[in-house]
Amino acid sequence: MICGLFREGKLKFLWPFNFLANSILKFDYILVQDEKSKKIIQNLGHNNTCLCGDTRFDRVYDTMSQDDSIEIIEGFKGNKLCMVAGSIWEEDERILVNYINTCEQDFKFILVPHEINKQKISKLRESISQTSILYSEFSEKNNKSDILIIDNVGILARLYKYADMVYIGGGMGPSGLHNTLEPAIYGVPIIIGKNYSKFSEAKQMIELGGMFSIKNDQEFKDRVDYLSKNKLAANKIGLINSNFVLDNKGATNKIMNYL
């Protein structure tokens, strides 16, 4: 078994009679993502258990290492501060739009809805008091807006390299927090919503000080204003996140050594 991830509450009832628990013990080797999983499996009686880590750290590092520049985004950002809001839902949009509509700073915003839906994107644009532009419509002549809305799929992970700070969607509602490792490797501060308890990497980055959880509009404003006005502090905060990814990569090589 590769990259196993187990939780105590999920497996308490499995042993000794459950089919799944017995099946787990039939593996010659079980490679797990974290120390808690290793202890759980060892407590079931499996001795060939190894902590290999999470291959997602390797994937985001590999993505960062590729030269995937996006000319349109470079032209849009210019020399201004830029926030990328990735995989946002309606609950996230309300907080973002409220800030955008009252923002007095010289800021660029790249908004990436979780669901690329024409009607929902139109509704989002209507809620923003400033003029916005769609990625599909962007050109050298049509580039005067400070708000760019991404209306195609497949480029989100590549957008984070242009961010000075990032908001990750999904945490303000029940949808589930989106990938926070993708922006972390680029060394930027990350803001998320209030619901993140099921995401160990988010909890770790918050404990380290590289990520911030907000519950409402005011907390979001306070955090963004601080990061935008304190560039040196923002850079140090972002470095915490990139170091977190670098410190945890290497699972792929460990797994290959067992194959």
Model segments located where?
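Short hydrophobic/aromatic-enriched beta-strand-loop microsegments
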Residues: 1-2, 48-54, 106-112, 132, ...
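Conserved catalytic-core segment of nucleotide-activated headgroup transferases in glycan assembly
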Residues: 65-137
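Catalytic binding pocket for nucleotide-activated donors in carbohydrate/polymer assembly enzymes
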Residues: 27, 43, 156, 161-238, ...
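Short active-site oxyanion
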Residues: 25-29, 81-82, 108-109, 146-147, ...
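Conserved active-site histidine-acidic residue motif and adjacent donor-binding/catalytic loop
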Residues: 137-157
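Active-site and donor-binding regions of nucleotide-sugar-utilizing enzymes
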Residues: 1-66, 84, 88-90, 102-103, ...
